[in-house]
Regions:
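Alpha-helical transmembrane segments and their immediate juxtamembrane boundary regions
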Residues: 6, 13-16, 20-109, 167-203
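A short amphipathic helical element positioned immediately N-terminal to and/or at the very start
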Residues: 10-13, 159-163
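Short, charged/polar, low-complexity loop and linker segments
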Residues: 1-16, 137-145
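Membrane-proximal soluble regions of multi-pass membrane proteins
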Residues: 101-161
Length: 203
């Protein structure tokens, strides 16, 4: 026996699947943000930032602004240059992951005038909240089955667009996260593997 693809049961299953993907993306983004927050917390509670400033930033700062003589090395210059993309990719990661968690709830945002989007939805929470309880109750009672199915289709479409945007931003955030780790690993390798300049008193 074939299943009607435009039945309330089938459409509700599709909506549940899309909502499941949205929750999955939100959870992944939350995990990455939590990991990034924990990493920053470790840096703030240790002396890494202080040592990094003293070793990388302070000599350039003193030389450029105060005219203080400073001895530079290839190692220090390389670490300083590597710090810039690390910060850039880290901030970009946070930005993209926050876009994942940013709510996008207005049905009007998805109406491109090419499809019959149901703006006066009986399922969408914002459309319901704009009405009084009595208005919502009356409109729900007189809603036809065809209108209800169209309303379900609208929710599936809008949630699918939301889900697609979320995963696009999540992929960007994950890519920035990977680049940040690579930059951090490169900084660690350069700092511990390459010898310090013998004539540099700071090193």
């Amino acid at each position: 026996m074939s299943t009607n693809p435009y039945s309330a049961e089938e459409l509700n299953k599709r909506l549940d699947r899309v909502n499941g993907w949205i929750n999955n993306c939100d959870q992944k983004s939350g995990i990455l943000l939590a990991f990034g927050g924990a990493f920053v917390a470790v840096l703030l509670t240790s002396d890494v930032i202080g040592k990094g400033y003293y070793y990388l930033i302070e000599p350039f700062y003193s030389f450029w602004l105060d005219g203080v003589d400073a001895t530079f090395s290839l190692k220090r210059a390389t670490l300083f240059c590597g710090l810039l993309p690390t910060i850039y990719y880290g901030l970009n990661m946070v930005y993209n992951l926050l876009l994942v968690l940013k709510p996008k709830t207005k049905i009007e945002d998805f109406n491109d005038d090419s499809s019959p989007i149901t703006n006066n939805s009986k399922l969408h929470f914002q459309s319901i909240a704009k009405k009084s309880y009595r208005e919502f109750q009356i409109e729900s009672k007189v809603q036809t089955e065809s209108a209800y199915l169209d309303d379900l289709c609208t929710q599936i479409y809008c949630n699918s667009k939301i889900c697609d945007d979320k995963f696009e931003n999540y992929k960007k955030g994950l890519d920035d996260f990977t680049k940040t780790l690579i930059c951090c690993f490169g900084e660690i390798v350069i700092y511990f593997i390459f010898p310090a300049h013998p004539t540099n008193p700071v090193e």
